[in-house]
């Protein structure tokens, strides 16, 4: 057993412990000292740092990292989508494309360097499973499907062997699931098929983009807004499709798509009633504030998320819509949008809530006996009074390092 002490230990599951200590055995936390309790032996002094669990990035698209810096911020979501399509030039991400895989490996390592231990990654190619595992991260790669015809070559059944192969590469660290893209890009039949596939799987966790833009809300309500023209522009017009006349959450709920193992990503445009419904279901809402503003959908109503009682996790989204994969930058953005939310709740979102949503809560998310010793140390200036507030608003990249145990 090895002992470590630091100016602050932030277990997340309890208030910060000043002049605290913890013990590690076999790469797992074996004990956390109670406030005021002396260490039972000589301890390695980590210095004036706050030790906290590695962060959890609950939503990103690592396979798009090859497009980093090529898609500019836009005034509207449809403008950003058009930029993305033009920049890609018809190129699709593939597992045998070294441009894609090399960029994904770099991005996964970058996420790790920023203090990330767990990740929820969206992938069309499943190229990122090996990249994530090689970077020392844990989590889920969601195989994203979209289409309005189950026989279009992207069907759930036809792609099952690809997921099985990828899951073997991921081992225990990186599991593979299946996920629908969004309400405007997936047919009701495919949603139901994906739900059946998830229910029959060992992972049973999925993710879906919901309520990201106001155009999505209009499209589902009565078929209006910018989406019909955009879908026609990309060659995916919804011929013969009847709008459900429902909000995004209500529509997915009617299809049986939402449960306590569903990650609902973005939620920028969701009404209070929809947020309360997510809370009652037990779904986790993943907010990506920097990306939302980059793609022109506006600022997410972070305070309303918490007020509605929704479980809130944090994601960066892809490097096509954000400068980096730094979750401390996301926390700073969340703090600006939600000044009344207690700092610990924001920290929980970037650690415990994300870990539990991705099914890795037994290993990550808090500093408690039995958890993996995946810990980061954040350097603290002398003037810090409220350590949790500092962590959500003032952390610099150079302040973050991994604790070597």
Specify the residue positions occupied by each region the protein language model found.
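Histidine/acidic residue-rich metal-binding segments in metalloenzymes
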Residues: 1, 40, 128-134, 158-284, ...
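N-terminal metal-binding scaffold of metallo-dependent hydrolase/deaminase domains
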Residues: 1-40
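Active-site metal-binding motif and surrounding structural segment of the metallo-beta-lactamase
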Residues: 36-52
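Alpha-helical scaffold segments that flank or form the walls of functional sites
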Residues: 50, 68-136, 158-171
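Histidine-centered catalytic micro-motifs
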Residues: 54-65, 205-214
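Active-site beta-loop-alpha junctions enriched in small/polar residues
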Residues: 61, 124-125, 144-148, 179-183, ...
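Active-site gating loops and adjacent loop-to-helix segments of metal-dependent hydrolytic enzymes
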Residues: 66-102, 140-148, 213-261, 334-341
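C-terminal cap of metal-dependent C-N hydrolases
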Residues: 356, 372-405
């Amino acid at each position: 057993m090895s002992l470590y002490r630091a100016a602050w230990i932030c277990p997340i599951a309890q208030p910060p412990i000043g002049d605290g200590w913890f013990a590690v055995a076999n790469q797992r936390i074996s004990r956390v000292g109670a406030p005021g309790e002396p260490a039972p032996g000589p301890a390695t002094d980590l210095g004036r740092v706050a030790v906290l669990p590695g962060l959890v990035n609950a939503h990103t698209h690592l396979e798009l990292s090859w497009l980093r810096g090529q898609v500019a911020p836009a005034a509207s979501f449809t403008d950003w989508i058009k930029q993305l399509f033009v920049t890609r030039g018809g190129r699709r991400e593939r597992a045998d494309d070294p441009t894609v895989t090399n960029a994904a490996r770099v991005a996964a390592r970058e996420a790790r360097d920023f203090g990330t231990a767990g990740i929820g990654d969206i992938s069309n190619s499943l190229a990122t499973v090996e990249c994530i595992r090689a970077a020392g991260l844990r989590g889920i790669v969601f195989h994203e499907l979209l289409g309005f015809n189950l026989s279009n070559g992207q069907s759930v059944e036809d792609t099952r062997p690809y997921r099985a192969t990828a899951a073997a590469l991921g081992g225990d660290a990186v599991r593979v699931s299946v996920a629908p893209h969004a309400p405007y890009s997936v047919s009701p039949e495919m949603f139901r098929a994906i739900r059946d596939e998830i229910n029959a799987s060992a992972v049973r966790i999925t993710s879906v983009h919901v309520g990201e833009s106001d155009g999505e809300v209009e499209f589902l309500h009565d078929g209006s807004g910018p989406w019909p023209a955009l879908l026609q522009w990309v060659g995916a017009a919804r011929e013969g499709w009847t709008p459900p006349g429902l909000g995004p959450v209500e529509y997915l709920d009617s299809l049986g798509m939402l449960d306590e193992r569903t990650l609902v990503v973005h939620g920028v445009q969701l009404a209070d009633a929809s947020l309360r419904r997510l809370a009652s279901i037990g779904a986790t809402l993943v907010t990506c504030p920097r990306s939302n503003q980059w793609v022109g959908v506006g600022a997410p109503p972070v305070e309303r998320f918490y007020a509605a009682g929704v479980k809130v996790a944090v994601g960066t989204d892809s490097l096509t819509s954000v400068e980096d994969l730094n979750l401390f930058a996301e926390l700073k953005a969340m703090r600006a949008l939600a000044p009344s939310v207690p700092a610990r709740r924001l920290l929980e979102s970037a650690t415990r809530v994300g870990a539990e949503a991705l099914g890795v809560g037994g290993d990550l998310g808090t500093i408690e006996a039995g958890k993996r010793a995946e810990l980061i140390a954040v350097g603290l200036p002398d003037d810090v009074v409220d350590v949790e507030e500092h962590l959500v608003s003032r952390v610099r990249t150079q302040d973050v390092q991994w604790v070597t145990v």
